[in-house]
Design a protein with these regions (language model features):
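Extended, well-ordered protein cores
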Residues: 2-382
Length: 382
């Protein structure tokens, strides 16, 4: 539901505040369920604090652009849904929090049997209050090749309801009244968070044998179909120095990916990401014990957004890298890959002035402290 912020009264909690609270509730739940994620958050905050202490200019810049307070907050999470009715209802749930679907991603092109969108705030004020977004994928059961498994998957999904009656009632109330009171907002966040919690018991009717068959067909299918609900797949905080995070994760007991994905650190564009590898968790399939591997912790370092011209150059350079050096699964050529990546991206201007001059990136402009001192004064010359 799209809510008019101007219609909000003092008796209602704003959708932006509800989203910010929901993000914190999700973070607390995930820290409890996946202790390694709590360790990751502590590391991110330690690194960000060190970077800001060592770079007063960066701290001042972030203070002026209203970004400092939310540096270490989670930027996004990811979930996987099983049927269209779940997507329809989750859109209403996110709508209460001012989140709208943005973009469409057909992941079948990457041999993943889902298509996806991202739910987030779409205006500057909302993003400033809470940038949290949820990447939401929907299973395409028609792409399950085995007819027997496909029919069983559809049967299991048809039987489940991932939304509680109180949550449905609160969504309907928010849509009807135009918002939620403080008490209702608290109940809403509690019920909404339950949708994404981990269940150590598989869905009714899922045996260990069936789970293995689903997993062998596609791990994503098993992750969606064989559980009672769409447990959060990962959460992603933001760091100011991802290479330090990458180096320090093993020191704190986390099994980090072999390389940081994205452009090299010498080229501050787009997004760089890394994560600790998905954990193996115990699951009960009726009377049998089993395991499931899906959930992990991710980190991102955000830089300049690219124009179409900039994105074209980025894609060309990355394709050149992958044609020559592909990262191996065991990490044995990580140093070679990173060196070739850094060398290749020297063709991309690494400084903001060069990017702006060549029309490669987007920029926002803010009044500096010096400019504010002269606010309201006519220029001496034009």
């Amino acid at each position: 539901v799209k809510q008019d912020k101007s219609a909000m009264t003092k008796s209602f909690i704003s959708p932006d505040d509800t989203r910010a609270r929901f993000s914190r509730a999700m973070s607390e739940m995930y820290r409890t369920e996946v202790p390694a994620y709590g360790t990751l958050l502590d590391l991110v905050r330690d690194v960000n604090d060190r970077v800001l202490a060592a770079d007063p200019a960066l701290r001042k810049q972030l203070e002026e652009t209203d970004n400092l307070e939310r540096i270490s907050e989670e930027r996004h999470g990811a979930i996987r849904l099983g049927k269209a009715s779940e997507l329809q209802m989750i859109a209403r749930v996110f709508g209460v929090m001012g989140m709208q679907p943005v973009g469409y991603y057909d992941l079948t092109q990457a041999n993943v049997p889902v298509h996806s969108t991202a739910f987030r705030a779409v205006d500057g004020e909302g993003l400033s209050r809470s940038p949290f977004r949820v990447f939401c994928s929907l299973l395409r059961t028609e792409l399950i090749k085995d007819q027997g498994l496909r029919e069983k998957a559809e049967e299991l999904l048809a039987a489940r309801d991932i939304f509680s009656d109180p949550l449905r009632s609160l969504v309907e109330k928010a849509e009807k009244d135009g918002g939620l009171s403080e008490a209702d907002a608290r109940r809403f966040i509690t019920e909404a968070t339950k949708v994404f919690q981990w269940h150590s018991d598989a869905a009714p009717g899922v045996s260990k044998e069936l789970y293995i068959q689903m997993r062998d067909a596609d791990p994503r299918v098993a992750d969606i179909v064989c559980f009672k609900g769409p447990h959060i797949n990962h959460l992603t905080p933001r760091t100011l120095e991802i290479d330090t995070i990458q180096a320090d994760m093993p020191k704190r007991g986390m099994n980090a990916k072999n390389v940081v994905e994205g452009p090299p650190g010498s080229c501050p564009i787009l997004l760089r990401q890394t994560s600790f590898r998905a954990l193996t968790e115990k699951v009960r399939f009726g009377g049998e014990e089993g395991e499931h591997t899906a959930r992990f912790g991710e980190i991102e370092q955000r830089s300049a957004a690219l124009t179409p011209k900039g994105r074209q150059l980025y894609d060309q350079l990355l394709a050149r890298v992958l044609e020559n050096v592909k990262p191996k699964a065991d990490g044995s050529n990580a140093a070679e890959y990173n060196a070739f990546l850094d060398q290749t991206f020297r063709a991309f201007p690494a400084d903001p002035a060069g990017m702006r001059r060549e029309g490669l990136a987007y920029f926002q402009y803010y009044v500096t402290e010096k400019g504010r001192k002269h606010q309201g004064q006519a220029p001496a010359s034009l």
